[in-house]
Amino acid sequence: KLAGEKAVAYAMGGAPYYVVRTSWLYGPNGKNFVATITRLLNEKPELKVVNDQFGSPTYTMDLALAVLQNFIFPRELLASGIYHLTNSGTTTWYEFAKEIATLKKSETPVIPIATEDYPLPAKRPQHSTLINTKLPKLRDWKAGLEHFLEKYPV
């Protein structure tokens, strides 16, 4: 990732550029954690979800709006560089799944487990939380999730 970010800066040759880092994206299109958990809540008697990996779930519509407001139609030109854009707050995959279950009014138990108890083909970082210090903060991840599930019942 870092090499790609450096390549962008080099390729721009001094012209303004922006690299946006984000995490744990979900939205109305494609496969994502919210859609998967919603489906599994209806299919499985219980869900086991890792509780020791931390991040900031980010609603794609919030991200798109922030990109438009800050980079495409900004009030003032920003300095070139790397910007973090995620919904505010930090959670675990387990807490994220629990919140989805609560908002969906599901009675399927969601059980916390350790990463080591959930085999994945690729190792995941324990902390992928990004701190947004250069731009206005986006709404809390729970508010974004609630809005998403009201607007796009998956």
State each model region's role.
Residues R21-T22, V50, N87, A114, ...:
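A secondary-structure boundary/capping signal
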Residues T108, K123-V154:
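C-terminal amphipathic/interface module of NAD(P)-dependent oxidoreductases
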Residues L2-K6:
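Active-site helix adjacent to the Tyr-X3-Lys
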Residues A7-G55, M61-D62, L68:
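NAD(P)-dependent short-chain dehydrogenase/reductase
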Residues L63, V67, L85, F96, ...:
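Non-catalytic, hydrophobic alpha-helical segments
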